[in-house]
Design a protein with these regions (language model features):
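A position-specific signal in ABC ATPase nucleotide-binding domains
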Residues: 19-20, 27, 37, 164-167
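ABC-type ATPase nucleotide-binding domains, specifically the catalytic core motifs of the NBD
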Residues: 64-73
Length: 183
């Protein structure tokens, strides 16, 4: 947590391997992610970032990441965990509904739940979330938090909403950390 501009998103992107640290190392499970290789590290992680988008394609494609022979049962399970399954079933073509630039318009909250379902489909051991539930009402956020907390996943969350912060086992207040000025 911390005020805007303190570096929460930047730190999260360094931790998930999207940005390289200017100094120091990123260690996960006692392994330096640079030494095991970013691609190897990313196989066990998933990210839901503020700027994430849905791709032009079906909801099946969007949740499975366009995986060949996507596991439909697991897609439905991920959607249920994200409290979006019932809404998908009400869409014109259910999971075959086309979304994205030319597809069905969906709300910001629906988009976030689909993006979280996509992340869960990867079966991550670490899930990085940057304001990933900011467009959700408290009920949907609570359902998702409870559902994910039942999984064996480490969540690293950037959030402003008190209920999201309260769901964490550990909280780091970045406004309390010494910051080094850019060189």
């Amino acid at each position: 947590v911390g005020p805007s501009g303190v570096g929460k998103t930047t730190l999260l992107k360094v931790m998930c391997g999207l940005l390289s640290p200017t100094s120091g190392d990123v260690i996960a499970d006692n392994l330096d992610i640079q030494k095991i290789g970013i691609n190897n590290f990313r196989h066990g992680t998933a990210c839901v970032l503020q700027e994430d988008r849905l791709f032009s394609g079906s909801l099946i494609d969007n949740i499975s990441g366009f995986e060949d022979n996507a596991d439909m049962d697991f897609i439905v399970e991920c959607a249920r965990r994200c409290n979006i399954h019932d809404e998908i079933m009400k869409m014109p073509m259910g999971y075959e509904t086309i979304v994205g630039e030319l597809g069905l318009g969906i709300s910001g909250g629906q988009k976030q739940r689909i993006l979280i379902a996509r992340a869960l489909y990867r079966k991550p051991s670490i899930l990085f979330m940057d304001e990933a539930t900011s467009h959700l009402d408290l009920k949907n956020e609570s359902v998702i938090n409870q559902s994910i907390s039942g999984l064996s996943i480490t969540r690293i969350i950037v959030a402003h909403r008190p209920s999201t912060i309260a769901s964490a086992d550990r909280i780091i207040d970045m406004s309390q950390l010494p910051m080094q000025a850019p060189a």
